[in-house]
Amino acid sequence: MKDQSGKDSIINIADSIDLRKPIKLKVWSTEALAGTSPDQTREYTISVRVHKHDPDSLRWNYVANISNSESIKEQKTVILGENILTYSVVDNVLKVYIAQKGNAMSWVSNSLEENPFKNSLPSSILSYNNKLYATTADNNDGNVYESTNGIKWETSGLFENEHVNLLLAPLSNKITYIKTINETKVFASTNEITSNAKTDQELQVVPDDFPIGNISYTTYTTATGLEGIMLIGEHAKQPIAGDIEAIVPWGYMGSIWVSFPPNNEETSCPVLQTPTIMYYNNQFYIFGEKFESFYTSEAGLAWKKANKKFSFPYQDWSEADFKPSKEQPEFRGRETYSSVLDDKNDYIYILFSGGTASFEEEVEDEEDEEKSSKATKTHTYTYESEVWRGRLNQLWFDKDPLNAGK
């Protein structure tokens, strides 16, 4: 190692070393030290990279507005190949807004061709084998419709002679769904259609406490290589855990659907409006409107609030006249949204419909001179039809170790 004059010096490991810049170390063999083989040396360069971002935190970035001219309302979003597609009813017309995952700053509005959905959102929509599959809101005919681009739709032959009520979730080799047989709703999958693996009498009957709509699902692979589905949604009667209404996930490991009711109120996920479930960094997460926090679980049974580092953007409102911006974003209080997970790049996309957000926050009571009591303050702000994406910093570091964290 060079000293201040540029000459070689011997390192004393008890000394402190400045590692803010790369340093060169020269290692001498015993022969080189003895002078018998002076060329038997080797040089090493040590460079220590210090991340400027906490690896356990979510990093959020504003991407774009879905539309600057159209008012986006209730929406459903899905990924097809390298594209993100968001469906929304605008001025009583169903439209799809499309952007590339690699260029989500640019969104193109499209009217649907051969539109079977009329002026309503699909009741269920998913991506499987480079196609989209969806059911209509009224679904009187029990048909499923398919599309290769999200714009032009036609009746799907994959579900021929089936009366499908609702699509649930895809795995690598099949789509799971609910169908009606002799006025009874049962669980089924597309590989059972093609292989006749089960007779109608062998299919699992859909229980009364299974979600009836607004399905959110996530897929995952276990340590042993088994594919699974975890699913949540709207219930005819919301489940109860102790004294609170709770979200009860349903799981599927290739054969039957099983509920995951919480053991008690303390380990339950409280009911949320329009909840979303995702499997991210080997954990299950649930969040919903108002965007107060994530709830997390290792196996889908016991839930708790996620670490504060794994959170949505929030700001300090103590300054007078503070208003959120794209540079200082605030998610609390927001409502109508949709979300998709880009598994390839580990991005969590959240797409908002524009609106006015309002939330309450506990602050110090200004009238309390001793500052020992709390008061509740309401904050209100407006936001646009925005696209945001977040990623855990550690996953960012892993994908780009040379540049991440800078």
Kindly label every feature range from the protein language model.
Residues M1-K73, K374, W396, D400-K406:
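Beta-rich interaction/scaffold domains
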Residues H53-N61, N103-S109, I151-T155, I193-Q201, ...:
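Beta-strand initiation motifs
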Residues N65-G81, E114-N130, T155-I175, E202-L226, ...:
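Repeated scaffold domains used in trafficking and secretory/extracellular systems
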Residues Q75-V90, S124-D138, L166-V186, T219-I240, ...:
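Short beta-strand elements that form the blades of beta-propeller/WD-repeat-like
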Residues K95-G102, G142-K152, T184-S195, G242-G254, ...:
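Beta-propeller blade signature
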Residues G102-N196:
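A generic tandem-repeat structural signature
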Residues E327-K406:
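Blade-level signature of beta-propeller repeat domains, shared across WD40, Kelch, NHL, RCC1
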